[in-house]
Amino acid sequence: MSLAQRLRPAEGDPEGALVLLHGRGTDENDLFPLLDELDPDRRLLGATARGPLSLPPGGSHWYVIRQVGSPDPETFHATYALAGGWLDGLLAEHGIPPERAILGGFSQGAAMTHALGLDAGRPRLAGLIALSGFIPQVEGFELGDVTGLPVAIGHGIYDPVISVEFGREARDRLIQAGADVTYRESPMPHTIDPAFLADLRGWVSARVPAAA
């Protein structure tokens, strides 16, 4: 089993990849427009994936919620393995090394981004974008060597779903571990700040510079 996906081709040969993971209750179409927001020149292969678990009456998610910050271990680890295999296969199929791939997500997708991008057993990526999420607290997840790893974190100050404290905790933990953290708080609820997205265009371009 793999993940349903939607691809946005690069204009020419892809110079890297930009992969985005949606939040709870939506699907691979939700963040698809952000691929062009973040990579307007289409230098990168763009991809979005659908979480493997279904929610009635529609939409998908990545894991069962026990409490905010601590996913259900059984569904989390099953999805972690599935999503990791999908991501690795996508990059291999298109000949893109992990160090030229950016992974990002919103809400549950941000938690999965942290898991897939920070875990000790995973390949090092070019950068991570975590919007309104958290670093998951779950048995079996171990923070790897993140020294110098670019991580962009955005969070709404008035987020009633995932408190901004989770964003601050992720920021502080990653800075302490040596990551290169870009952090933005915005005066809004559980949503994505378009101004931060605009600022991230340059960040994305710098993380995957033009091939020599």
Task: Please describe what each predicted stretch is.
Residues 105-109, 113:
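Gly/Ala-rich beta-loop-alpha elbow adjacent to hydrolase catalytic centers
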Residues 123-135:
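A conserved short beta-strand
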Residues 103-105, 131:
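Short beta-strand immediately N-terminal to the catalytic nucleophile in serine-hydrolase-like folds
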Residues 1-100:
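Serine-hydrolase catalytic machinery in alpha/beta-hydrolase-like enzymes
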Residues 58-65, 133-151:
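Flexible "cap/lid" loop of the alpha/beta hydrolase fold
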Residues 165-212:
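C-terminal catalytic histidine-bearing segment of alpha/beta-hydrolase fold enzymes
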Residues 33, 115-119:
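Active-site signature of alpha/beta-hydrolase-fold catalytic machinery across serine-
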Residues 152-155, 159:
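Short beta-strand/loop motif that positions the catalytic acidic residue
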